[in-house]
Amino acid sequence: MELLEAAITVLREEGEPLHWTKIQDLALRRGYIDPFETPDVRKHLLAALAGGVRSGALVKISKGVYECAG
């Protein structure tokens, strides 16, 4: 699963805006992200979240807090 897809899945499942650290924690715990497949998960997840905001898939609510668009 791609990092943006994992983040969107977590946000949809939780149904509320979440801080990126909570998104990362839940995605790792649920097995959506494999830390052995993606080195430096933090850096790549933050880049994926920024890309999601640019593409319109996510909305940045406040510093580090995201929700699904629409």
Question: Which residues does each PLM region occupy?
Answer:
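Charged low-complexity interaction tracts in eukaryotic proteins
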Residues: 1-6, 14, 18-21, 26-70
